[in-house]
């Protein structure tokens, strides 16, 4: 009776393990890259959905300046501490009467406060405003892989009547064109 493996049998097993490891080493990074792309695409979809959820609410609550400050996660900090637009916080304290160039910060802040991370680099936020509104994830050219940007494409109006377009831009894969969604915004509605 034989009580072990021959050298040839052991070499065959080692060769099979080596082949499987080589195949796994080439397949696994592709699977991980695909998962990261899906996370960025999902974040893009969530940003679009979140902004859409705030559309049209101004007509229902026009003049209720604190609505966003009390209902939008992360908005309180944006509204009470950041006044880069030159106004005082009480002048611009809600979705209905906020310039789009500040509103994009408020929307991005919602995702920052809720822990959105860049799947390609988890030390960076996953959603940001082009005007560099939150944390240190500030890119002047707004094209960093894994980040979804809430940019302001156009803005008009004043007082309680700001309107224009947001451009949601997500860079999900090196060398690929970004996902872009242009969203009209009209506080007059």
Which residues make up each language-model segment?
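N-terminal single-pass transmembrane signal-anchor helix
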Residues: 2-29
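Intrinsic disorder/low-complexity segments enriched in polar/small residues
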Residues: 3-4, 43, 47, 125, ...
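Membrane-proximal N-terminal amphipathic helix
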Residues: 33-63
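Periplasmic/extracellular, small/polar-rich flexible segments of pilin-like filament-forming proteins
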Residues: 56-189
């Amino acid at each position: 009776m034989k009580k072990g493996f021959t050298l040839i049998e052991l070499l065959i097993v080692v060769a099979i393990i080596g082949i499987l490891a080589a195949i796994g080493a080439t397949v696994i990074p592709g699977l991980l890259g695909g998962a990261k792309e899906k996370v960025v695409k999902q974040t893009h979809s969530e940003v679009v959905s979140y902004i859409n959820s705030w559309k049209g609410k101004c007509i229902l609550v026009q003049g209720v300046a604190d609505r966003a400050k009390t209902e939008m996660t992360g908005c309180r900090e944006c509204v009470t501490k950041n006044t880069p637009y030159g106004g005082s916080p009480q002048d611009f304290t809600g979705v209905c009467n906020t310039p789009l160039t500040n509103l994009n910060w408020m929307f991005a802040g919602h995702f920052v406060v809720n822990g959105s991370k860049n799947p390609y680099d988890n030390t960076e936020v996953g959603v940001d405003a082009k005007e560099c509104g939150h944390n240190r994830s500030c890119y002047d050219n707004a094209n960093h892989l894994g980040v979804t940007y809430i940019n302001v494409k156009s803005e008009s109006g004043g007082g309680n009547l700001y309107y224009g377009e947001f451009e949601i831009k997500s860079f999900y894969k090196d060398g690929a064109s970004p996902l872009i969604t242009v969203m009209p915004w009209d506080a007059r509605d």
